[in-house]
Amino acid sequence: MARGKPGKAQLDMVSDMLSILTDPKDCVSDGTDVRNYGELSGLSAAKRLFADILGCKPEECFIGGNAGLTLMYDTVSKAYTHGMIHSEKPWCKLDGAKWLCPSPGYDRHFKITESFGFDMVIVPVTKNGPDMDVVEELVKDPEVKGVWCVLTVPFLTYFASLVWA
């Protein structure tokens, strides 16, 4: 078992995408050749697409690579060393910091917060995801800095009660 990694059947479902683009001109979006690194915050076309889906502005979207765990690590690391946009100081300078960890969950995510010294607070998981009554109570504590939210494989869904909480 490889915790959250797609199986061969799931990968095979998207194999046809590898042959969709056959002309290099199809690899240019808003003047950017997408075969190269592109823009740091993501391609403009992708930001417009997801802004429409999410009901926000394109400039509020960050489009990263396909390695969600890497993006999560980078975000926690940056907050730890520099703080977040509304932080008074970097999280490493705080007297205490906690992270909500729905359990059962993914050990790789938990290892990130463990390695930065967070107190990991277990949140029970129901058939619909983390127990939101517990989450809503725990986030009243200003030391709580985040919660691990992981999509359900194989359908890549999440529950509206957490997304809109």
Q: What residue spans do the PLM features occupy?
A:
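Conserved core of the PLP fold type I
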Residues: 26-27, 31-165
